[in-house]
């Protein structure tokens, strides 16, 4: 739901004389008409108004076509002022002469369009994305930059030809001409003439003075007399309504004090707002239309805001109510007896009536999109098609690459990107490891601009891999620096601060830290005792976080509100000097994953004062006492996040530094252990899922949190299938994102409102469960310094891992199984077997023993990310927890296998830059199979069935099956199964009891990716 507060512009009568005009810097007198553009605050996670005098507002270049719809507060103005705003907007804003924007005979100057000579060669045309050379004529449209909304309206530059091509999208109306551009008169004569030819104004035949300046709609011209009469009546009714409300407000100001007005609201069971004008508005609304009854959904207070009545209540402690209506329920407004002494109130008799709304606002209420469709800054691949993944991106190349510049340029352009020679204009840099290490002047510019550097292989991988663009950036990254890679933002067509482009899954705002490594390094340097001192305090080397009674006085709080689009954090620390009795309270706040925010450091008189102030702030922000054992979430209040302060970092570090120097394990096993315990791979996996590593580092992944998140997804799945209210979906989404902190940058957190979003988050939690196991193993266990870190980690897996001789019969059978069952449709890569390991998990054979006698046992494939294998080997293949939604899996919650190697290999999530994957072969006791052709969310197998088989159109040739240790190995080449009415291309096998699986082999595979580009 798009609330009125989402609007880019606001108009009102100045509540005081304190605000200064952003144009002329003069104060804006109290009660005078003022207008504002709403901009993202750089200091906190929210928007603030930039106020202007009415006349100054139009001079800075704001284009408004429909004030009724585009400007918050418009309908609360006096009628005459509404007409003033409308006429000024229709006339194109500021004029060549005068200040009102109306009444001048001079040609109107368009404040939001400009022409000038480029002052440098740094600007880029937003049409063709090419550089605009210094001294060239360039044209601009003032818009909100989706990447920097806090800057408000800024010039977005175009080549004249590109501007002409995008004329309609940019809102340069047919009747506008080049001579109306701001700065046109300063151009040379020949440039003026050229622009006049390119941008002629189309004049309507026989247009009379007083006709609309706006392009007149042909349909509007032909309006019937009946329709015109209807519009005229509505206009008169709106004017009469407005006059009545303002007459009452004017009289109330004369005869009633603010306290009197508050008492009137309380007597009529209405909430009392803050601010004199808001109180007056609500009393007048009640007197004219009746006292508002509580919201039917949450019993909250309804409040009029421009285009409708909005509920200000909360459905739950996590989510505000979304009710919005133009016809709220009311009762008679009652004036208490004691107020009848006031002559005006005694005489006032208003017939209860319904509020009338202009047709534009009625339409906007009906067409209001849900939060999930709200636009946000465009980011990587946000407007790219599948065959043009680098659309809107500019690529810089540095150093000697394996291909010449023309070849690289052709590759980039074929993928939708463009070459650039300037670091500060680049989205991405392609170079070599040698160039990064050399760090010449050009590379320093790249680092200064915080541009990620990736290897040349990235270009091949983009077309060959099924991974997301962000996964590929991470797989090929060469630089320790680099913010989230962004495309050039798609143009904002209307000046609303929103992009019409589809949102990218990985869209982000400016990131706060220069990559994960740097911020983590900073935190390690400041770790003292129980918690890390925030470096922004400036006291990381001279103070520590106070710990008293086993409780660390440090808190990180989170608050997500999808309706408002906020994703806020609040940090609070009590710091004690390392040497002296000095104490400080440090707090910081802002938007997760961006530079938006601020902080404050206060020195306190004593330890007691510091503790008291800390506890007061904590209670103010959360609604809970600091020492409270059971936390209760309150509406609009923050929720505490579990944060890893780095206590276990040293334990992890010991087990990842200089591994292999003392190991007694075979080299292939050593390499395998290093691979599955690679911390950087775990972090990359979390970043791919947009998890905020600052708020939820590896060390604080907990089963409790993940299981709670599964439960929320189950509720989401139920709510979606039952068609529950928007409020319930919102509530669940807010809870999920608060529990598992995500980094969305400047875009709104997306609603979890469909099966696909549930599926994606279920997959994320499945992977997080295994990452949690791996990291828990890393930081726990033996501290024996005499052992090699690899051997220590190997022992934690409780799995016997032996290298299979390449020349053995079983190795030959397995290689044949890989070769023969590679599906023809999985042709993006070939598979090469590097190592084969025979594995025996502790206790698994014993667990499998009852199923050893079951008929129909097969050796089948199971693929997974490398980050999941520590969990798989130490705990076995597991079934999703009871909390997980059953619809997150095609055939319900079970363990899935395949008889085609490439079907399972796709789940390894490899890429050209990271081509090594791991895959399992398990003995699976299938018994009697329940055969299915389409998705079925199995919760219990039919009687007499032991497993499910999803029937595919292709199956390994059964005549080629062989037996290995009494187990069937379906290693025949793929042939038609004869089953055509199925949704599956290849077979799937699912068991619902973990004891039916006995893992036998683990294969290390190299994915040799192909490409059709060269």
UniProtKB/Swiss-Prot annotation:
Tell me the impact of changing residue 826 to A: Strongly reduced serine ADP-ribosylation, caused by abolished interaction with HPF1
Q: What organism does this protein naturally occur in?
A: Homo sapiens (Human)
Zinc fingers classed as PARP-type: ranges: 9-93, 113-203
- What compartments host this protein? Chromosome; Nucleus; Nucleus, Nucleolus; Cytoplasm, Cytosol
What keywords does the record list, in alphabetical order? Acetylation, ADP-ribosylation, Allosteric enzyme, Apoptosis, Chromosome, Cytoplasm, DNA damage, DNA repair, DNA-binding, Glycosyltransferase, Immunity, Innate immunity, Isopeptide bond, Metal-binding, NAD, Nucleotidyltransferase, Nucleus, Phosphoprotein, Repeat, Transcription, Transcription regulation, Transferase, Ubl conjugation, Zinc, Zinc-finger
What would changing residue 883 to Q do, according to UniProt? Does not affect ADP-ribosyltransferase activity
PolyADP-ribosyl aspartic acid occurs at which residues? 387
| Major localization class | nucleus
Question: Consequence of mutating residue 45 to A?
Answer: Does not affect DNA-binding. Decreased poly-ADP-ribosyltransferase activity
**Recorded catalytic activity of this chain's protein:** NAD(+) + (ADP-D-ribosyl)n-acceptor = nicotinamide + (ADP-D-ribosyl)n+1-acceptor + H(+); L-seryl-[protein] + NAD(+) = O-(ADP-D-ribosyl)-L-seryl-[protein] + nicotinamide + H(+); L-aspartyl-[protein] + NAD(+) = 4-O-(ADP-D-ribosyl)-L-aspartyl-[protein] + nicotinamide; L-glutamyl-[protein] + NAD(+) = 5-O-(ADP-D-ribosyl)-L-glutamyl-[protein] + nicotinamide
Under Gene Ontology molecular function, one entry of this record is: protein homodimerization activity
Effect of mutating residue 567 to A: Decreased poly-ADP-ribosyltransferase activity upon binding to damaged DNA
Task: Please describe, based on the UniProt annotation, the reported consequence of changing residue 993 to G.
Answer: Abolished interaction with TIMELESS
Q: What is this protein called?
A: Poly [ADP-ribose] polymerase 1
Q: Please give the residue positions where the record annotates the modification Phosphoserine.
A: 41, 177, 179, 185, 274, 277, 364, 782, 786
PARP alpha-helical domain location, by residue?
A: 662-779
In this chain, the stretch annotated as Disordered covers 198-233, 361-385
What, per the annotation, is the impact of changing residue 865 to A? Increased affinity for DNA damage sites
